[in-house]
């Protein structure tokens, strides 16, 4: 074989290899585990917050209960929502009755480029919870918050395991829990963290609302590519 034909064949082979590499490398798996809640080590990646930090009386916990029957362990986010305020509180908050769990800061980012939805496997109490995604700002500037927050409601059916699938397009930009009217696009390649929260005001029509106890079991959180 001449040197020219050898070079041509090598070029063709390299092109075929590059095309194969592109297909395999650029299309992400159908699903991607983000967080799981199967051990106490898994729960150490999260911290709790509530209105008690601002004079409220709500409380929350995140635990792995010992089932004792050999079944798989799952995290339980539970507590009590109160719309009352501590007597003599120095804080002037407009509303109380909320609790949440947020992933702790970590080095790097969660890359959700190529995915269409967030999925949570949960078993709840009939309340509506709030799923939040925190992303890095597209452009950071002085005086600007270090991240953007995007929120969507997720219903937790009572006493039944349910996989909630929330398209990323359904997450709306928010500021301090309120939807803001601004044209923004999520930066899915630079996710800084996530949270799950609940408030006494409820959410979806027909969902349980008001002050009182709440409880939701969480198995895992994944990113999905939808068909």
UniProtKB/Swiss-Prot annotation:
Compartment(s) where it occurs, according to its Swiss-Prot or TrEMBL record: Mitochondrion
Alphabetically ordered keywords of this record: Chaperone, Mitochondrion
Signal peptide, first to last residue: none
Subcellular location, principal: mitochondrion
Membrane-spanning parts: none
Family per similarity comment: Belongs to the CIA30 family.
Function as written in the Swiss-Prot or TrEMBL entry: Chaperone protein involved in the assembly of the mitochondrial NADH:ubiquinone oxidoreductase complex (complex I).
Matches recorded under PANTHER family: COMPLEX I INTERMEDIATE-ASSOCIATED PROTEIN 30, COMPLEX I INTERMEDIATE-ASSOCIATED PROTEIN 30, MITOCHONDRIAL
Protein name, entry field: Probable complex I intermediate-associated protein 30
Organism name: Arabidopsis thaliana
Species classification: Eukaryota, Viridiplantae, Streptophyta, Embryophyta, Tracheophyta
């Amino acid at each position: 074989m001449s040197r020219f034909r050898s070079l041509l064949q090598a070029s063709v082979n390299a092109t075929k290899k590059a095309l194969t590499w592109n297909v395999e490398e650029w299309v992400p798996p159908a699903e991607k585990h983000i967080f799981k809640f199967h051990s106490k080590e898994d729960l150490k990646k999260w911290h709790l917050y509530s209105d008690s930090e601002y004079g409220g009386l709500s409380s929350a916990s995140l635990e792995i209960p010992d089932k004792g029957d050999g079944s798989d362990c799952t995290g339980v986010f539970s507590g009590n929502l109160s719309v009352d305020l501590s007597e003599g509180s120095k804080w002037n908050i407009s509303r109380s009755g909320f609790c949440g769990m947020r992933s702790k800061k970590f080095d790097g980012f969660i890359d959700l480029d190529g995915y269409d939805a967030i999925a949570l496997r949960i078993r709840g109490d009939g309340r509506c919870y709030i799923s939040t995604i925190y992303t890095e700002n597209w452009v950071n500037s002085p005086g600007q918050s270090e991240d953007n927050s995007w929120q969507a409601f997720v219903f937790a059916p009572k006493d039944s395991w349910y996989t909630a699938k929330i398209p990323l397009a359904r997450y709306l930009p928010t500021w301090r829990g309120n939807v803001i009217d601004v044209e923004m696009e999520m930066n899915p390649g630079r996710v800084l963290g996530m949270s799950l929260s609940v408030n006494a005001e409820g959410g979806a029509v027909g969902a349980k609302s008001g002050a009182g106890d709440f409880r939701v079991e969480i198995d895992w959180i994944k990113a999905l590519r939808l068909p």
